[in-house]
From Swiss-Prot:
It comes from Lactobacillus gasseri (strain ATCC 33323 / DSM 20243 / BCRC 14619 / CIP 102991 / JCM 1131 / KCTC 3163 / NCIMB 11718 / NCTC 13722 / AM63). The keyword Lyase does not apply. Binds 1 Fe(2+) ion. Removes the formyl group from the N-terminal Met of newly synthesized proteins. Requires at least a dipeptide for an efficient rate of reaction. N-terminal L-methionine is a prerequisite for activity but the enzyme has broad specificity at other positions. GO terms for molecular function: metal ion binding; peptide deformylase activity. It is an enzyme of class 3 (hydrolase). Its cofactor is Fe(2+). This is Peptide deformylase. Keywords: Hydrolase, Iron, Metal-binding, Protein biosynthesis. InterPro entries: Peptide_deformylase, Peptide_deformylase_sf. Its EC number is 3.5.1.88. Belongs to the polypeptide deformylase family. Disulfide bonds: none annotated. Fe cation binds at C111, H154, H158.
Length: 184
């Protein structure tokens, strides 16, 4: 079971590396890691389990965040009612197209690997088309928009050595392009 002490923190070089692609069939250790990463997200979104194990809630977890520089990320995205609207483990994901229009979260973003609050809007594409493989090696292409697209972009950034605050405007953290969608 992944706990908060297992989460790699900002400053660790693994978070700034471009993660290595995986080959199929996946080794058992990577399948187990995928299961553990998804289970962390499930547990962290359950108030009783999260409190018992002092877990910070998460909607995504990339392998570099648990010290593994591999192209794998788990996503468990709820809607505003707490119902899961997207659940998947990406292996070797690639963004193959993205919208010109940007979106951001009204409250900004956080990250399990970043312990301090960093204020500012994090503009990301409002829509993404992503090519990836499942843990079983099934090839998929999906389209995401709004909140799920933001979460996917955040996790894929981790696989490319980027953290959310890299996208914040350093001179004016709350400056946005006119047509940016602000999601509350």
């Amino acid at each position: 079971m992944i706990l908060m002490h297992d989460i790699t923190r900002d400053g660790n070089p693994v978070l700034r590396q471009v993660a290595k692609p995986l080959t199929f069939p996946l080794a058992d250790e990577y399948k187990e890691l995928a299961d553990e990463m998804m289970q962390y997200l499930i547990n962290s979104q359950d108030p009783k389990i999260a409190e018992k194990h002092q877990l910070r809630a998460g909607v995504g977890l990339a392998a570099p965040q648990v010290g593994k520089s591999i192209q794998m990320a788990a996503l468990l995205v709820p809607n505003d009612k707490g119902e899961i609207i997207f659940k998947e483990v990406f292996v070797n994901p690639k963004i193959i197209s993205e919208s010109v229009r940007k979106a951001c979260l009204a409250e900004g973003e956080g990250c399990l690997s970043v312990d301090k609050d960093i204020e500012g809007y994090v503009p990301r594409p409002d829509k993404l088309k992503i090519h990836y493989y499942t843990v079983d090696g099934e090839e998929k292409t999906i389209r995401l928009k709004d909140y799920p697209a933001i979460v996917a972009s955040h996790e894929i950034d981790h696989l490319n050595g980027h953290l959310f605050y890299d996208r914040i405007n350093k001179q004016n953290p709350f400056d946005l392009a006119e047509d940016t969608i602000v999601i509350s």
